[in-house]
Amino acid sequence: MKKLVDRVTYSLLNEAPIALGLPTLYRDYCRVCGSPSRRGRPWKLARGLVESWQIDSRWQRMIERREGLRCGECGSVSRFRYLARVVMDELGAPDPGYGSFADYANSEDFRRLRVAEVNGCGALHKYLDLNPELAYSEYGSEDPAVPSEDLTRLSYGDSEFDLVLTSDTLEHVPDLAGALGEIERILKPGGRHIFTVPAIWDGRMTRRRAVLDGDRIVHLYPPSYHGVWEDRSPDRLVFLEFGDDALDYLRTPGTDIRVRRHPGNPAISVFIAVKAGGPDEAGAG
């Protein structure tokens, strides 16, 4: 009964205000660090990005909450808190002993997994780093301690990882099919690629904004950049804007893919691609 009351309270005081663009009132615990600290303000989308994305005020508010409402303790934004929740659910860690991702990351259940974090997952990174065999990389890294990995040409071996994590990266990759094929290749049978990309679920279809022709970028629409609008570095350029048909673009022949949307904010979506050949599949039928 207490769980039901908490859930109804959370929906009324947190999820409903988010959907309506109102302040949140409920002091909820953070799925990343477990802290009950209050949330910060929504992030503010640049006017140029709002215009290039062609989103209405409702979707603007939801995306601003996706990228904001920072935890006062660990600094995680809404996107990473929901990613943490989905990772725990997918890896079979809803045990009451794992109240947060920080708890789970300290467990033997997590430490025995082979994990690749391709580009940092925000506040999740310091907990992922508790895994002694974490393969962490940043595209274009100049830090000798942090390797650079190109998602279309990963250096890892076949069937190496139980879990691959990417967050808001694939929309910036010119060769999406190549990147997804590489991720599928390095996953073990039954392994999971759990990831986020911005997707607008308002009836629009996925739009390709740019293509790569040899070494030359051809813009099909005016260039659009995520993050700080004024920072027009090449790795922030948007090649794909995902819409209602996002799963069709993110599916590969060897994976089963689905999406989980935050119940109070559909702008917060987490995708789960499971490589075929896992133990559950082998035992089916």
Residue ranges and their predicted role:
Residues 162-174:
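A short SAM/SAH-binding and catalytic strip from SAM-dependent methyltransferases
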Residues 12-106:
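N-terminal juxtadomain amphipathic helix
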Residues 35-37, 76-79, 120-125, 140-142, ...:
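Short, solvent-exposed loop/turn segments at secondary-structure junctions
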Residues 3, 14-28, 32-35, 177-284:
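S-adenosyl-L-methionine-dependent methyltransferase catalytic module, highlighting the catalytic core
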Residues 151-164:
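A short acidic, Gly/Pro-enriched loop at the edge of an enzyme's catalytic core
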Residues 106-153, 201:
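Class I SAM-dependent methyltransferase SAM/SAH-binding core
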Residues 41-45, 85, 129-130, 204-209:
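Short aromatic-enriched loop/helix-cap "lid" or pocket-rim segments at secondary-structure transitions
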Residues 155-157, 174, 243:
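GHKL-family ATP-binding catalytic core of two-component histidine kinases
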